Amino acid sequence: MIELKKYNSKNSSYQFHVKILSDIELSSNSEQAQRETIFIKDICNRVLKSSTVVYTLQNEGQTLGFIALSVSSIDSFPSLQVDYLFVSSQYRGVILEELEDTKTSIYLIEFAIEIAKEMQEKVGLRYLVLLPDDERLQKVYRDIGFAKFSKKDWMFFKL
């Protein structure tokens, strides 16, 4: 059964990163795994400081990945920002029937878009924004409907 669990400063402890790291599978490339660990620890610290919320995606108790979200402003436009999107290495690029025949990463981005749309109805919000790690990911996000800000590496999804 698919489940999204929300973690914020109210329900997370200083050992939050230990739980997240024990629930996921990092890259088999040691340099990439080290980079992922650094990002995950940083995101977990942001959760404890109330600046980020993390949603883990689980299937039958197995963590498929997570998305970290925060509120920001890009070029003076209020935005929901994807701070980090992580997919456990064994699920990267894998289409899952349990996720309505989509990849974990796409499922999490679509979830973030829905949250942004819900927020837009309650407060002024214009975009969902993210900073892709590389050009390959830029194409993935363009296919979903994201566009690049002019003169910046950031991408946005207009709500």
Where are the model-predicted features located?
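Non-catalytic substrate-recognition and accessory regions of acyl/acetyltransferase enzymes
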Residues: 1-102, 106-159
